[in-house]
Amino acid sequence: MQQHSSKTAYVYSDKLLQYRFHDQHPFNQMRLKLTTELLLNANLLSPEQIVQPRIATDDELMLIHKYDYVEAIKHASHGIISEDEAKKYGLNDEENGQFKHMHRHSATIVGGALTLADLIMSGKVLNGCHLGGGLHHAQPGRASGFCIYNDIAITAQYLAKEYNQRVLIIDTDAHHGDGTQWSFYADNHVTTYSIHETGKFLFPGSGHYTERGEDIGYGHTVNVPLEPYTEDASFLECFKLTVEPVVKSFKPDIILSVNGVDIHYRDPLTHLNCTLHSLYEIPYFVKYLADSYTNGKVIMFGGGGYNIWRVVPRAWSHVFLSLIDQPIQSGYLPLEWINKWKHYSSELLPKRWEDRLNDYTYVPRTKEISEKNKKLALHIASWYESTRQ
């Protein structure tokens, strides 16, 4: 077994798998179990690094969410919510249906993040990984985009209030982190950065580069919307061009990163054209930023990712590996993992850590897309630096 670092905590419990709207819903937390077992089977995760999530208290949830919304989620947990109330709080559609004990299961996701926050701030660990979290669409008073409670926003507010931390949220999910953004739009103690597929064609339709915050929060919201069919080179170029100036200027005490892996070309819900190359590279760059600017303090969350067999386990494994300073993996996946899960998978499981790219389609407009993305990224970087002068 490889040498493991005790500096990193990894949140896992089978309880996190209970966050499930229904069996056909695309948000399937089985991806968390698949990732965890892949890491364990590959001798990359030690059981001693795993920490159990607690259940967040109502007061903690209400750091972001409204009292009446939390009460509505409790009612929905027991099937005693009216149709009008369900509609009011976003609980009456295919995206965010009601399920048994949804309050407890959602509060457990939040509690996992707060567990890591306390461990880091007490000096017991340097960084943490919570792949079961990353519910960035939840609004203060409404469910949205498969998200009930916004664990990222709550954790950011918790760190700011309880520990007086300046918090930077870096969100690389294909969907704009709207719930998180609006939670801090007029605040200056938390900066939100989101690079995502443009909202012109993808939920939630927000995240335009002109959304920059308001009042004392102006300049503390940064959005980098990319064109559909953006490929690896352009995504990574725009990310690195825009994110490091934000870190340098804001000078956060801690980073929270949302590692949605739905920028992958195999993801069924988005239109970006990236591969595992980007998904492996992103967390290592965020780790570099944390090491360079926050003394290593970072919590890495999961997020979107709806190809749970061929994409999520390999990509999310590297989120954790970046935290423990292990290199990007190559070669064959553990046979033990493949043999266990091949009977459950709806498609052929990958055999190697690398993408095969046998079904990858190169877009004829790659140069045009990349130039448009870079022009916008340079504009955003220039605007941001001008606000700091």
Curated annotation (Swiss-Prot):
One of its GO terms (biological process) is epigenetic regulation of gene expression. Disulfide bonds: none annotated. Pfam families: Hist_deacetyl. Keywords: Acetoin catabolism. One of its GO terms (molecular function) is histone deacetylase activity. The keyword Hydrolase does not apply. Pathway: Ketone degradation; acetoin degradation. InterPro entries: AcuC (IPR003085), HDAC_PDAC (IPR050284), His_deacetylse (IPR000286), His_deacetylse_dom (IPR023801), His_deacetylse_dom_sf (IPR037138), Ureohydrolase_dom_sf (IPR023696). Belongs to the histone deacetylase family. Role in growth on acetoin or butanediol. Involved in the breakdown of these compounds used as a carbon source. This is Acetoin utilization protein AcuC. It comes from Staphylococcus aureus (strain COL).
